[in-house]
Amino acid sequence: MANIKSAIKRAELNKIANERNAQQKSAMRTLIKKFEAAPSEELYRAASSTIDKAASKGLIHANKASRDKARLAAKLG
């Protein structure tokens, strides 16, 4: 465990950020699974939006975002 006050604070902030990132990635995966179960234009837009947001925040690589969106689009039509 950290002894320095700033290190303790950084550790706590890292924990909070880690939880937030995990929650956002989980939400993205959930929307992708919902779309794959029942493809529709509305679910495609929602999944695509969450993928773009994850990529812009650095949660996933830009190439992965592009690949995921292409796979969803292929399943849509």
Swiss-Prot record:
Binds directly to 16S ribosomal RNA. This is Small ribosomal subunit protein bS20. Disulfide bonds: none annotated. One of its GO terms (molecular function) is small ribosomal subunit rRNA binding. It comes from Lactococcus lactis subsp. cremoris (strain MG1363). The keyword Cell inner membrane does not apply. Belongs to the bacterial ribosomal protein bS20 family. The keyword DNA repair does not apply. One of its GO terms (biological process) is translation. Pfam families: Ribosomal_S20p (PF01649). One of its GO terms (cellular component) is cytosol. InterPro entries: Ribosomal_bS20 (IPR002583), Ribosomal_bS20_sf (IPR036510). It comes from the Bacteria. Keywords: Ribonucleoprotein, Ribosomal protein, RNA-binding, rRNA-binding.
